[in-house]
UniProtKB/Swiss-Prot annotation:
Residues 427-583 form the Exonuclease domain. It comes from the Bacteria. Required for replicative DNA synthesis. This DNA polymerase also exhibits 3' to 5' exonuclease activity. GO terms for biological process: DNA-templated DNA replication. One of its GO terms (molecular function) is DNA binding. The keyword Nucleotidyltransferase applies. Its main location: cytoplasm. The lineage of its organism: Bacteria, Bacillati, Bacillota, Bacilli, Lactobacillales. This is DNA polymerase III PolC-type. Keywords: Cytoplasm, DNA replication, DNA-directed DNA polymerase, Exonuclease, Hydrolase, Nuclease, Nucleotidyltransferase, Transferase. It is an enzyme of class 2 (transferase). The gene is polC. The keyword Disulfide bond does not apply.
Amino acid sequence: MSDLFAKLMDQIEMPLDMRRSSAFSSADIIEVKVHSVSRLWEFHFAFAAVLPIATYRELHDRLIRTFEAADIKVTFDIQAAQVDYSDDLLQAYYQEAFEHAPCNSASFKSSFSKLKVTYENDKLIIAAPRFVNNDHFRKNHLPNLVKQLEAFGFGTLTIDMVSDQEMTEHLTKDFVSSRQALVKKAVQDNLEAQKSLEAMMPPVEEATPAPKFDYKERAAKRQAGFEKATITPMIEIETEENRIVFEGMVFDVERKTTRTGRHIINFKMTDYTSSFALQKWAKDDEELRKFDMIAKGAWLRVQGNIETNPFTKSLTMNVQQVKEIVHHERKDLMPEGQKRVELHAHTNMSTMDALPTVESLIDTAAKWGHKAVAITDHANVQSFPHGYHRARKAGIKAIFGLEANIVEDKAPISYDPVDMDLHEATYVVFDVETTGLSAMNNDLIQIAASKMFKGNIVEQFDEFIDPGHPLSAFTTELTGITDKHLQGAKPLVTVLKAFQDFCKDSILVAHNASFDVGFMNANYERHDLPKITQPVIDTLEFARNLYPEYKRHGLGPLTKRFQVSLDHHHMANYDAEATGRLLFIFLRDAREKHGIKNLLQLNTDLVAEDSYKKARIKHATIYVQNQVGLKNMFKLVSLSNIKYFEGVPRIPRTVLDAHREGLLLGTACSDGEVFDAVLTKGIDAAVDLAKYYDFIEIMPPAIYQPLVVRELIKDQAGIEQVIRDLIEVGKRANKPVLATGNVHYLEPEEEIYREIIVRSLGQGAMINRTIGRGEGAQPAPLPKAHFRTTNEMLDEFAFLGKDLAYQVVVENTQDFADRIEEVEVVKGDLYTPYIDKAEETVAELTYQKAFEIYGNPLPDIIDLRIEKELTSILGNGFAVIYLASQMLVNRSNERGYLVGSRGSVGSSFVATMIGITEVNPMPPHYVCPSCQHSEFITDGSVGSGYDLPNKPCPKCGTPYQKDGQDIPFETFLGFDGDKVPDIDLNFSGDDQPSAHLDVRDIFGDEYAFRAGTVGTVAEKTAYGFVKGYERDYGKFYRDAEVDRLAAGAAGVKRTTGQHPGGIVVIPNYMDVYDFTPVQYPADDVTASWQTTHFNFHDIDENVLKLDILGHDDPTMIRKLQDLSGIDPITIPADDPGVMALFSGTEILGVTPEQIGTPTGMLGIPEFGTNFVRGMVNETHPTTFAELLQLSGLSHGTDVWLGNAQDLIKEGVATLKTVIGCRDDIMVYLMHAGLEPKMAFTIMERVRKGLWLKISEEERNGYIDAMRENNVPDWYIESCGKIKYMFPKAHAAAYVLMALRVAYFKVHHPIMYYCAYFSIRAKAFELKTMSDGLDAVKARMEDITIKRKNNEATNVENDLFTTLEIVNEMLERGFKFGKLDLYKSDAIEFQIKGDTLIPPFIALEGLGENVAKQIVKARQEGEFLSKMELRKRGGASSTLVEKMDEMGILGNMPEDNQLSLFDDFF
């Protein structure tokens, strides 16, 4: 053994007997590689032989543990002089391999770790079942096994797999039997569920006759048989069968037409035992119409044969007969005026917990004849706006509430404290063990205590108590106490009296004292003994306040941290003694660190201001009683999310008290404090707490059933007794008792959807904590929480007697609903912020600019347009919106950035004049920059002013300026000019954060908020949840059932977020709580902006919303301006060179073959995608107007494909005449002779895809008017195909930006390529890019092949786009340089003559921070070694190696050598 190796063995304290083994005789350290940045040490050992497996594991574990203490990761491998290939040793190491990455992947380990291995003919042979002996494992996993065995010292082995028939048959048999058991259990479970569902149905009504078809006589008997056929539950079908009959609901339908004209209806049905895929063929349209009843939501009876679908490989019914059936929905059968009101209902806005939309909840209550229904989502009010609108529509009162998380502001450390010296006090530190957590329903089985003085135990108390019944397995497992411990124990009352004597003249101490003291007091009260009145210290709260930096303050973690012995946690005597030891550590630290000497100081001086963060949460339901209450509710929600958020939104009790006006409080569910007090402290304690509330909630016994499983309540009788106790609490506290349903879904069969959603949260969620331990441990079942009718609710409470049940279910809930006033949740008007003299300023800026361009007096056409627009803008209070946008654009312009407009704002000439948009919506015209003379073309013959021929002003000879896109104002603010303006602006991505801050600066921090969004579970995500549930809970679902469950679980709120550029501005004469609560996005309390709590769409017609979006175009323009010094405003929109790009490549000096495309569109915004390039190739645009058409066609839906494209190909129309942008419809129809109002209405119907959805009468009226004015039929037919259209103003703004970029591509190419790669390129491969044309083209060909085979990754697709531009640049004679350690910038590409030098950030895996660090470090001095580059430059070893491979580092030396133990520890 070498000295160095021996030193290492001493360091890791390797056992001497192992060190003396023969394997260690010549042990040595061959090499150590030290990676300082990653703190990884690689050891390479030499041994005489392969180590015994126990020795290897000991060496491995001690190395890891020792170096972990110094925050160093360790790996090692072994070279063995002699290798023993005995089966036992090989088998042991083979199994050990699966404990090491990457062999420990789940699929490899589960399939291979238990297999047998042998060594034969110089090969390691693995005997495997046939189904794992495949190429996947051979290719992806066996090489890893070879490497791991080599690291163990076996050298490079050849591994082969052989199929073991016996093993294959055995495992197959086990799998089949396990699967059959799963299916059998699923069948039984679902059949029972169906029986339960049927039992809840109201009496069957006589079915309405199904629609009859003219079948031939010979089908009559078959139809009769169909009517009487036995219905088969879907769950029972496992194989192909004939003439099966199902009844169920259709939940998915897809209709297709084959090339031969036949139709196929693929649909899915469920009967709630399972689901099935079905298909029905129809030979023609007439037969297809017979099956219109196959629609989503329809209930059908179907008969057909079950066959395996050759495409989906799933069992599918080929339907032969189908008829619609009556589905008997649940109804509330109580008479009018005798129906309950549900006051505790969750919607899908209760995060990952409830299913119904607020609309469906309200619709169900209204359908049942209920006069009101409450919304009580968990800690949020995001369903309020939709609930408000739906309730008004349904004619039902919506009661707006929430289920809040209430906490005490400062949970006390000491109860009933007195003036007492802590150092001189005597303490009784006690603990109790019980059969459950309920003092009223469970029993004491042990009381133990240590009496302590100055840190010493002076006396002990330890008594078991016989509860009079056998202990449950759970209690024994948790506490370690058995029935044997309790034999011969003293009676409870004797122990209680003895313990009271033991505790005299002392301070009581317990960990989580509220539980122990509550349990003791409940038992004292039950036996007429005095309750605890002496001071109590809770060591749990003591620890939380003394050591807030600790994450866990349970007894177990604390004893480990302070090295206090706790041998038998959950036995009272051991827990009490350990708690006592901790107490005196706490007292010492409190005295030394905080000066705490007196008992009174614990609460006054030590309890932290933010102790609410650790306080135990209790639920309460809060309801809005009036408009004042609504605003207070919004404030509470805001405070709970902004100021008091800790894991969940919390409302401290004092905060609730300060905002309680206009609110009513209920005691909520089993997580409420009154229910908890009844369960754990007794009725007296519950009465005291109940006085704080306005009513007591009781829920159906089924809701409390999980408490029985968790052993908090003994049985059904125990649940009923708790409910009676709650009623007694209400009586004694003089509070009404109301029966609520805790609704989480509407129908009983929807329970499974909630189950899937909740279980997807994993065991970290409280609701999923398992009962018991071990493999069989499962979470408690979820309660039956569907929306119950009055009859169902009365049945649930029948045990109370008819009169009392009716009182709590009907009378009291109706009375409460009557106390609630109607409130306005969403305001009916727009409230814009106030800017002094906004109207005057907008008008002044408009006329000032108009006079500057068009002269004074203005041309009539300009004057009339301005007057028309200002009348609308100023008259409807929109001036402040215009002015705010102008101020934002102006500020960004002053910082050197252009701002592009989006949407239809370019339809407003006032917006153009005050600088919001560059788009001029007037008809095409000339205007003289010198004398302001102008000429307007108003006959529609010219599509864009930029296409007018150049000519001089006839008055002064100055060359005319050209402008005007002919866009009507109506497309922005509606025909009457009263639509709230939606001004969307494209700021440079670099300047967007500054623009956002400008809003705050203009309007004030307290009035500007990011527009909030709500993220829900997508159906694909829900599909994953279903598959996870299926896996984790031993379920087996066919594909159609998975689809149904995924659809049912989708739509539930999962998180919140923010619009990428939306800023909501609250009027400065109101506050945000007049409109919405506020919060942080995704509960990120470190976020710099607060968001609206409501989805911004819910209030976008009430407050100003500014869309300040980030976009690459303004950033690119700024970059080009910085590189060239050219003002982009001066770039002409009709440059011949730029227009030549759209017809060929000659202007670039290359051929189409060189760059792989027939035009010069590569890298041009709006026109560079494959789709638009194809459109350009087909249409050959030559004018700005035609480019606008292309932009509109490419952004619309069903405007180009199957529409304009065909018209152009067939020669029916041209690019100029087809419908391209929405505004063109109105302009064209007015030029054709239609009235402006009708032209506008037709445009609106077409652009929204409503042409075929409006009534035939309305549509025919439009068609007649168009034909009367000679509008061609092809135009009318084209209107009917359109689903969505792009605004012309949006197209004009985008095209104008694109042409400016294109100008640089043509006239200043190296600058264009520099800007493109700096800003737009998403992926780089620097070695390929700098290796020249051949390398670039070869890589492009490689990716092209992968694309054809659908093998290209997203990164490769992005890279291909980059390489297209690189290829074009190189073909044009420019060069792409290598990354240079001393010349490259961190972020931007650099121009060196005709060469581009890439920045550091272009290197894969090198982020912005490291790039900036390298540039900063090189300014401080040359890098002398790779180690220095890693240390000073912050580059990882991987990045340094990559730079070295690319030749960037030249001959830079390697890392400095380190001694093995330098810097160790």
